[in-house]
Protein backbone atom coordinates (compact mmCIF):
# COMPACT_ATOMS: atom_id res chain seq x y z
CA UNK A 1 0.00 0.00 0.00
CA UNK A 2 1.32 3.45 -0.95
CA UNK A 3 1.72 6.25 1.57
CA UNK A 4 1.05 9.88 0.67
CA UNK A 5 3.76 12.54 0.80
CA UNK A 6 2.58 16.15 0.69
CA UNK A 7 5.14 18.65 -0.62
CA UNK A 8 4.77 22.42 -0.27
CA UNK A 9 7.31 25.12 -1.12
CA UNK A 10 8.18 27.94 1.24
CA UNK A 11 10.39 31.01 1.42
CA UNK A 12 13.82 31.40 -0.21
CA UNK A 13 16.62 29.89 1.87
CA UNK A 14 19.89 30.64 0.13
CA UNK A 15 21.34 28.96 -2.94
CA UNK A 16 21.62 25.41 -4.25
CA UNK A 17 25.31 24.61 -4.05
CA UNK A 18 27.01 22.97 -7.02
CA UNK A 19 29.04 20.45 -5.01
CA UNK A 20 28.80 17.63 -7.57
CA UNK A 21 32.45 17.18 -8.43
CA UNK A 22 33.66 14.01 -10.10
CA UNK A 23 36.72 11.83 -10.51
CA UNK A 24 37.93 11.78 -14.13
CA UNK A 25 36.53 13.21 -17.34
CA UNK A 26 36.03 12.40 -21.04
CA UNK A 27 38.72 10.05 -22.32
CA UNK A 28 41.33 10.74 -25.00
CA UNK A 29 41.29 7.10 -26.16
CA UNK A 30 38.78 7.17 -29.04
CA UNK A 31 38.40 10.32 -31.13
CA UNK A 32 35.20 9.10 -32.80
CA UNK A 33 33.47 8.65 -29.45
CA UNK A 34 34.65 11.92 -27.93
CA UNK A 35 31.94 14.33 -29.20
CA UNK A 36 29.11 12.33 -27.61
CA UNK A 37 31.06 11.86 -24.41
CA UNK A 38 31.89 15.56 -24.15
CA UNK A 39 28.25 16.47 -24.72
CA UNK A 40 27.15 14.10 -21.94
CA UNK A 41 29.80 15.45 -19.57
CA UNK A 42 29.06 19.10 -20.35
CA UNK A 43 25.34 18.56 -19.70
CA UNK A 44 26.08 17.79 -16.05
CA UNK A 45 27.61 21.22 -15.36
CA UNK A 46 30.40 19.58 -13.35
CA UNK A 47 32.03 22.36 -11.30
CA UNK A 48 35.33 20.61 -10.64
CA UNK A 49 37.06 17.37 -11.61
CA UNK A 50 39.95 15.52 -10.03
CA UNK A 51 41.71 12.64 -11.75
CA UNK A 52 42.36 9.45 -9.80
CA UNK A 53 42.81 6.11 -11.59
CA UNK A 54 42.79 8.04 -14.88
CA UNK A 55 45.00 5.48 -16.71
CA UNK A 56 42.26 2.88 -16.14
CA UNK A 57 39.84 5.09 -18.08
CA UNK A 58 42.48 5.85 -20.72
CA UNK A 59 43.96 2.44 -21.44
CA UNK A 60 47.32 2.39 -23.21
CA UNK A 61 48.01 6.04 -22.35
CA UNK A 62 50.54 7.29 -19.81
CA UNK A 63 48.92 10.21 -18.06
CA UNK A 64 48.21 12.06 -14.79
CA UNK A 65 50.17 9.83 -12.36
CA UNK A 66 53.51 11.27 -11.26
CA UNK A 67 55.38 8.15 -12.39
CA UNK A 68 53.89 8.58 -15.86
CA UNK A 69 54.65 12.29 -16.11
CA UNK A 70 58.23 11.64 -14.95
CA UNK A 71 58.80 8.01 -15.99
CA UNK A 72 62.53 7.52 -15.25
CA UNK A 73 63.14 8.02 -11.54
CA UNK A 74 66.94 8.28 -11.78
CA UNK A 75 66.75 11.07 -14.38
CA UNK A 76 67.34 14.76 -13.65
CA UNK A 77 64.03 16.14 -12.39
CA UNK A 78 64.99 19.68 -13.39
CA UNK A 79 65.35 18.84 -17.09
CA UNK A 80 62.07 19.36 -18.99
CA UNK A 81 63.16 16.70 -21.50
CA UNK A 82 62.63 14.03 -18.82
CA UNK A 83 58.88 14.70 -18.56
CA UNK A 84 56.03 13.69 -20.85
CA UNK A 85 53.02 15.92 -20.26
CA UNK A 86 51.36 15.58 -23.67
CA UNK A 87 48.61 13.00 -22.97
CA UNK A 88 47.74 14.68 -19.67
CA UNK A 89 47.66 18.10 -21.34
CA UNK A 90 45.14 16.86 -23.89
CA UNK A 91 43.10 15.04 -21.26
CA UNK A 92 42.84 18.08 -18.99
CA UNK A 93 42.11 20.38 -21.92
CA UNK A 94 38.97 18.37 -22.70
CA UNK A 95 37.71 18.74 -19.13
CA UNK A 96 38.35 22.48 -19.25
CA UNK A 97 36.52 22.75 -22.58
CA UNK A 98 33.53 21.18 -20.83
CA UNK A 99 33.55 23.92 -18.18
CA UNK A 100 35.12 22.03 -15.28
CA UNK A 101 37.78 23.38 -12.95
CA UNK A 102 40.58 20.94 -12.06
CA UNK A 103 41.96 19.62 -8.79
CA UNK A 104 45.25 17.84 -9.42
CA UNK A 105 45.82 14.58 -7.54
CA UNK A 106 49.57 14.04 -7.16
CA UNK A 107 49.91 10.28 -6.79
CA UNK A 108 49.40 6.94 -8.51
CA UNK A 109 46.67 4.66 -9.85
CA UNK A 110 45.58 1.72 -7.72
CA UNK A 111 47.35 -1.61 -8.32
CA UNK A 112 45.46 -4.83 -7.64
CA UNK A 113 48.36 -6.96 -8.87
CA UNK A 114 50.39 -9.35 -6.72
CA UNK A 115 53.49 -7.19 -7.11
CA UNK A 116 53.39 -3.39 -6.88
CA UNK A 117 55.11 -1.43 -9.63
CA UNK A 118 54.18 2.23 -9.26
CA UNK A 119 52.64 2.68 -5.81
CA UNK A 120 55.81 2.07 -3.82
CA UNK A 121 56.57 4.93 -1.46
CA UNK A 122 59.08 7.30 -3.12
CA UNK A 123 62.56 6.47 -1.85
CA UNK A 124 63.48 10.16 -1.79
CA UNK A 125 60.53 12.35 -0.68
CA UNK A 126 62.49 15.53 -1.39
CA UNK A 127 63.05 14.55 -5.02
CA UNK A 128 59.44 13.50 -5.43
CA UNK A 129 58.44 16.90 -4.05
CA UNK A 130 60.65 18.66 -6.61
CA UNK A 131 59.03 16.63 -9.38
CA UNK A 132 55.60 17.70 -8.12
CA UNK A 133 56.75 21.32 -8.07
CA UNK A 134 57.69 21.05 -11.73
CA UNK A 135 54.25 19.62 -12.48
CA UNK A 136 52.75 22.73 -10.88
CA UNK A 137 55.12 24.90 -12.94
CA UNK A 138 54.04 23.19 -16.14
CA UNK A 139 50.34 23.79 -15.61
CA UNK A 140 50.45 27.15 -13.86
CA UNK A 141 53.62 28.90 -15.06
CA UNK A 142 54.17 27.59 -18.58
CA UNK A 143 57.25 25.50 -17.76
CA UNK A 144 58.20 22.83 -20.34
CA UNK A 145 55.87 24.18 -23.04
CA UNK A 146 53.13 24.34 -20.45
CA UNK A 147 50.13 26.45 -19.53
CA UNK A 148 48.85 29.18 -17.25
CA UNK A 149 45.75 27.34 -16.08
CA UNK A 150 45.88 28.48 -12.46
CA UNK A 151 45.07 25.04 -11.05
CA UNK A 152 44.64 25.95 -7.40
CA UNK A 153 43.95 22.67 -5.59
CA UNK A 154 46.62 19.99 -5.28
CA UNK A 155 45.94 16.83 -3.28
CA UNK A 156 48.85 14.67 -2.20
CA UNK A 157 48.49 10.92 -2.87
CA UNK A 158 45.31 8.83 -2.55
CA UNK A 159 44.30 6.38 0.18
CA UNK A 160 47.80 6.12 1.70
CA UNK A 161 46.37 3.63 4.20
CA UNK A 162 45.53 1.26 1.31
CA UNK A 163 48.40 -1.11 0.51
CA UNK A 164 47.23 -1.18 -3.12
CA UNK A 165 47.91 2.55 -3.33
CA UNK A 166 50.94 3.03 -1.08
CA UNK A 167 53.34 0.22 -0.32
CA UNK A 168 56.92 -0.19 0.88
CA UNK A 169 59.46 -2.97 0.22
CA UNK A 170 60.24 -3.49 3.90
CA UNK A 171 57.42 -5.21 5.77
CA UNK A 172 58.70 -3.59 8.95
CA UNK A 173 57.15 -0.40 7.57
CA UNK A 174 53.70 -2.01 7.57
CA UNK A 175 52.12 -0.72 10.73
CA UNK A 176 48.51 -0.57 11.85
CA UNK A 177 47.57 1.47 8.78
CA UNK A 178 49.95 0.04 6.20
CA UNK A 179 52.69 2.59 5.51
CA UNK A 180 50.54 5.61 6.34
CA UNK A 181 52.56 6.65 9.38
CA UNK A 182 55.98 5.36 8.35
CA UNK A 183 56.06 6.83 4.84
CA UNK A 184 53.10 9.02 3.93
CA UNK A 185 53.35 11.65 6.63
CA UNK A 186 56.97 12.47 5.78
CA UNK A 187 56.06 12.56 2.09
CA UNK A 188 53.19 14.94 2.76
CA UNK A 189 55.44 17.22 4.79
CA UNK A 190 58.06 17.39 2.04
CA UNK A 191 55.59 18.03 -0.78
CA UNK A 192 53.21 20.40 0.98
CA UNK A 193 55.96 22.64 2.35
CA UNK A 194 57.80 22.90 -0.96
CA UNK A 195 54.65 23.60 -2.97
CA UNK A 196 53.39 26.29 -0.60
CA UNK A 197 56.83 27.89 -0.42
CA UNK A 198 57.21 28.06 -4.20
CA UNK A 199 53.54 28.67 -5.05
CA UNK A 200 51.94 30.42 -2.06
CA UNK A 201 48.62 30.99 -3.85
CA UNK A 202 47.79 27.32 -4.42
CA UNK A 203 45.93 25.07 -1.97
CA UNK A 204 47.34 21.75 -0.78
CA UNK A 205 45.69 18.96 1.16
CA UNK A 206 45.26 15.30 1.94
CA UNK A 207 45.30 12.55 3.03
CA UNK A 208 42.32 10.96 1.20
CA UNK A 209 42.16 8.06 3.68
CA UNK A 210 39.83 5.08 3.28
CA UNK A 211 36.88 6.35 5.26
CA UNK A 212 36.66 9.21 7.73
CA UNK A 213 38.63 7.48 10.48
CA UNK A 214 39.07 10.00 13.27
CA UNK A 215 42.20 8.12 14.39
CA UNK A 216 43.90 8.39 10.99
CA UNK A 217 42.75 11.91 10.20
CA UNK A 218 43.57 13.01 13.73
CA UNK A 219 47.04 11.48 13.40
CA UNK A 220 47.52 13.35 10.13
CA UNK A 221 46.43 16.70 11.56
CA UNK A 222 48.53 16.27 14.70
CA UNK A 223 51.59 15.56 12.56
CA UNK A 224 50.90 18.60 10.39
CA UNK A 225 50.47 20.81 13.44
CA UNK A 226 53.71 19.54 15.00
CA UNK A 227 55.71 19.95 11.77
CA UNK A 228 53.99 23.14 10.63
CA UNK A 229 52.91 21.42 7.42
CA UNK A 230 50.17 23.31 5.55
CA UNK A 231 46.65 21.88 5.28
CA UNK A 232 44.24 23.87 3.13
CA UNK A 233 41.74 21.02 2.86
CA UNK A 234 41.17 17.67 4.54
CA UNK A 235 39.86 14.78 2.44
CA UNK A 236 38.78 11.15 2.68
CA UNK A 237 36.94 8.57 0.57
CA UNK A 238 33.61 6.91 1.34
CA UNK A 239 31.79 3.93 -0.18
CA UNK A 240 28.61 3.12 1.71
CA UNK A 241 24.99 2.10 1.33
CA UNK A 242 23.84 4.73 3.83
CA UNK A 243 23.56 8.36 2.64
CA UNK A 244 23.40 9.51 6.25
CA UNK A 245 26.86 8.00 6.83
CA UNK A 246 28.33 10.60 4.49
CA UNK A 247 26.51 13.35 6.39
CA UNK A 248 27.87 12.08 9.71
CA UNK A 249 31.38 11.89 8.26
CA UNK A 250 31.26 15.46 6.96
CA UNK A 251 30.18 16.80 10.34
CA UNK A 252 32.83 14.78 12.17
CA UNK A 253 35.59 15.95 9.83
CA UNK A 254 34.56 19.60 10.22
CA UNK A 255 34.56 19.22 14.00
CA UNK A 256 37.96 17.52 13.91
CA UNK A 257 39.47 20.30 11.79
CA UNK A 258 38.16 23.01 14.08
CA UNK A 259 39.33 21.19 17.20
CA UNK A 260 42.77 20.48 15.75
CA UNK A 261 43.62 24.08 14.98
CA UNK A 262 42.66 24.17 11.29
CA UNK A 263 39.42 26.20 11.29
CA UNK A 264 40.09 27.68 7.83
CA UNK A 265 40.72 24.35 6.09
CA UNK A 266 38.05 23.12 3.67
CA UNK A 267 36.28 19.76 3.78
CA UNK A 268 36.61 17.65 0.61
CA UNK A 269 35.03 14.26 -0.02
CA UNK A 270 37.66 12.91 -2.45
CA UNK A 271 35.70 9.85 -3.60
CA UNK A 272 32.17 8.63 -2.94
CA UNK A 273 29.77 6.13 -4.45
CA UNK A 274 27.15 3.61 -3.46
CA UNK A 275 29.13 0.84 -1.80
CA UNK A 276 29.08 -2.67 -3.29
CA UNK A 277 27.10 -5.43 -1.64
CA UNK A 278 30.34 -7.27 -0.93
CA UNK A 279 33.92 -6.15 -1.65
CA UNK A 280 35.11 -9.75 -1.91
CA UNK A 281 32.74 -10.44 -4.83
CA UNK A 282 33.09 -7.03 -6.41
CA UNK A 283 33.20 -8.21 -10.02
CA UNK A 284 30.44 -10.81 -10.03
CA UNK A 285 27.47 -9.92 -12.31
CA UNK A 286 25.08 -9.34 -9.41
CA UNK A 287 27.38 -6.73 -7.91
CA UNK A 288 27.97 -5.02 -11.24
CA UNK A 289 24.24 -4.76 -11.87
CA UNK A 290 23.62 -3.38 -8.39
CA UNK A 291 26.39 -0.77 -8.63
CA UNK A 292 25.13 0.53 -11.97
CA UNK A 293 21.40 0.34 -11.17
CA UNK A 294 18.79 2.93 -10.27
CA UNK A 295 19.85 2.42 -6.63
CA UNK A 296 23.09 4.23 -7.46
CA UNK A 297 21.18 7.09 -9.09
CA UNK A 298 18.77 7.56 -6.20
CA UNK A 299 21.65 7.29 -3.73
CA UNK A 300 23.61 10.00 -5.55
CA UNK A 301 20.66 12.37 -5.77
CA UNK A 302 19.94 11.90 -2.09
CA UNK A 303 23.55 12.48 -1.03
CA UNK A 304 23.77 15.70 -3.05
CA UNK A 305 20.50 16.86 -1.50
CA UNK A 306 21.49 16.05 2.08
CA UNK A 307 24.90 17.69 1.72
CA UNK A 308 23.35 21.04 0.80
CA UNK A 309 23.11 21.90 4.49
CA UNK A 310 26.42 20.37 5.56
CA UNK A 311 29.93 21.90 5.83
CA UNK A 312 31.42 20.17 2.79
CA UNK A 313 33.06 22.25 0.06
CA UNK A 314 33.14 19.63 -2.73
CA UNK A 315 32.09 15.99 -3.10
CA UNK A 316 33.84 14.12 -5.93
CA UNK A 317 31.79 11.18 -7.19
CA UNK A 318 33.79 8.15 -8.35
CA UNK A 319 33.82 8.30 -11.27
CA UNK A 320 33.04 9.35 -14.83
CA UNK A 321 33.65 6.39 -17.17
CA UNK A 322 35.27 3.75 -14.99
CA UNK A 323 33.04 0.79 -15.82
CA UNK A 324 30.06 0.17 -13.59
CA UNK A 325 31.49 2.65 -11.07
CA UNK A 326 30.86 5.43 -13.56
CA UNK A 327 28.25 7.71 -15.04
CA UNK A 328 29.14 6.96 -18.64
CA UNK A 329 29.18 3.49 -20.21
CA UNK A 330 31.99 4.19 -22.63
CA UNK A 331 31.93 0.99 -24.76
CA UNK A 332 28.30 1.65 -25.71
CA UNK A 333 28.45 5.46 -25.64
CA UNK A 334 25.47 5.76 -23.31
CA UNK A 335 24.81 6.88 -19.75
CA UNK A 336 24.28 4.69 -16.73
CA UNK A 337 21.17 5.43 -14.61
CA UNK A 338 23.23 7.51 -12.18
CA UNK A 339 24.03 9.96 -15.01
CA UNK A 340 20.33 10.88 -15.13
CA UNK A 341 20.38 11.60 -11.39
CA UNK A 342 23.38 13.89 -11.87
CA UNK A 343 21.60 15.57 -14.78
CA UNK A 344 18.57 16.23 -12.58
CA UNK A 345 20.79 17.73 -9.90
CA UNK A 346 22.63 19.81 -12.52
CA UNK A 347 19.25 21.19 -13.60
CA UNK A 348 18.60 22.12 -9.97
CA UNK A 349 21.83 24.15 -9.86
CA UNK A 350 20.36 26.40 -12.56
CA UNK A 351 17.97 27.74 -9.92
CA UNK A 352 18.82 31.27 -8.84
CA UNK A 353 17.62 30.57 -5.32
CA UNK A 354 16.76 27.62 -3.15
CA UNK A 355 13.30 27.30 -1.63
CA UNK A 356 12.44 25.81 1.74
CA UNK A 357 10.30 22.67 1.69
CA UNK A 358 7.52 21.39 3.90
CA UNK A 359 7.22 17.66 3.36
CA UNK A 360 5.58 14.69 5.01
CA UNK A 361 8.45 12.82 6.70
CA UNK A 362 9.24 9.50 5.02
CA UNK A 363 12.19 7.18 5.44
CA UNK A 364 14.49 7.14 2.43
CA UNK A 365 12.93 10.24 0.83
CA UNK A 366 14.62 13.63 0.43
CA UNK A 367 13.42 16.78 -1.34
CA UNK A 368 15.32 19.74 -2.82
CA UNK A 369 13.51 22.73 -4.33
CA UNK A 370 14.42 25.94 -6.12
CA UNK A 371 13.26 28.71 -8.41
CA UNK A 372 14.80 29.71 -11.74
CA UNK A 373 15.20 33.33 -12.85
CA UNK A 374 12.01 33.22 -14.93
CA UNK A 375 10.00 32.18 -11.87
CA UNK A 376 9.53 28.49 -12.63
CA UNK A 377 9.86 26.02 -9.79
CA UNK A 378 11.96 22.85 -9.74
CA UNK A 379 11.73 20.00 -7.25
CA UNK A 380 14.08 17.02 -6.99
CA UNK A 381 12.67 14.06 -5.03
CA UNK A 382 14.99 11.16 -4.21
CA UNK A 383 13.61 7.83 -3.03
CA UNK A 384 16.42 5.54 -1.94
CA UNK A 385 15.30 2.03 -0.98
CA UNK A 386 12.03 3.49 0.25
CA UNK A 387 8.44 2.29 0.42
CA UNK A 388 5.85 3.02 -2.30
CA UNK A 389 4.59 6.61 -2.30
CA UNK A 390 2.13 8.97 -3.92
CA UNK A 391 3.39 12.56 -4.10
CA UNK A 392 1.01 15.50 -3.81
CA UNK A 393 2.63 18.77 -4.85
CA UNK A 394 1.13 22.11 -3.81
CA UNK A 395 2.13 24.54 -6.58
CA UNK A 396 -0.32 27.48 -6.68
CA UNK A 397 -0.71 29.08 -10.10
CA UNK A 398 0.91 26.26 -12.06
CA UNK A 399 -1.09 24.96 -15.04
CA UNK A 400 0.97 21.81 -15.50
CA UNK A 401 4.11 20.11 -14.23
CA UNK A 402 6.73 18.35 -16.34
CA UNK A 403 8.14 15.19 -14.78
CA UNK A 404 11.37 13.34 -15.47
CA UNK A 405 11.31 10.01 -13.64
CA UNK A 406 14.25 7.67 -13.10
CA UNK A 407 12.93 4.27 -12.02
CA UNK A 408 13.88 0.62 -12.29
CA UNK A 409 12.30 0.52 -15.76
CA UNK A 410 14.38 3.42 -17.09
CA UNK A 411 13.86 7.14 -17.70
CA UNK A 412 10.48 8.58 -18.67
CA UNK A 413 9.19 12.10 -19.33
CA UNK A 414 5.56 13.14 -18.99
CA UNK A 415 3.28 15.93 -17.78
CA UNK A 416 0.71 16.07 -15.00
CA UNK A 417 -2.16 18.52 -14.49
CA UNK A 418 -3.87 19.63 -11.28
CA UNK A 419 -6.32 17.22 -9.69
CA UNK A 420 -9.74 18.42 -8.47
CA UNK A 421 -8.18 19.20 -5.08
CA UNK A 422 -5.81 21.66 -6.80
CA UNK A 423 -2.73 19.55 -6.10
CA UNK A 424 -0.49 17.76 -8.55
CA UNK A 425 -0.59 14.02 -7.91
CA UNK A 426 2.25 11.75 -8.97
CA UNK A 427 2.34 8.04 -8.26
CA UNK A 428 5.87 7.12 -7.31
CA UNK A 429 7.72 3.86 -7.51
CA UNK A 430 6.28 0.68 -6.06
CA UNK A 431 9.07 0.55 -3.51
CA UNK A 432 12.80 0.43 -4.01
CA UNK A 433 14.68 3.37 -5.51
CA UNK A 434 13.77 6.21 -7.87
CA UNK A 435 14.36 9.91 -8.48
CA UNK A 436 11.96 12.52 -9.85
CA UNK A 437 12.52 16.01 -11.21
CA UNK A 438 9.42 18.22 -11.31
CA UNK A 439 9.35 21.48 -13.30
CA UNK A 440 6.66 24.15 -13.59
Model-predicted regions and their roles:
Residues 273-368, 376:
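Aromatic/acidic polysaccharide-binding cleft in carbohydrate-active enzymes
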Residues 44-241:
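Substrate-binding cleft and catalytic face of glycoside hydrolase catalytic domains
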Residues 22, 95, 135, 154, ...:
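Conserved, mostly hydrophobic/aromatic
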Residues 1-46:
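Mature N-terminal, pre-catalytic/accessory segment of carbohydrate-active enzymes
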Residues 32-33, 179-300, 310:
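Noncatalytic carbohydrate-binding groove/subsite architecture in carbohydrate-active enzymes
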Residues 417-440:
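C-terminal beta-strand-rich structural cap/linker in extracellular carbohydrate-active enzymes
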Residues 405-422:
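Solvent-exposed beta-strand/loop surfaces of large extracellular or lumenal domains
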Residues 361-399, 403-410, 432-437:
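Carbohydrate-binding surface patches
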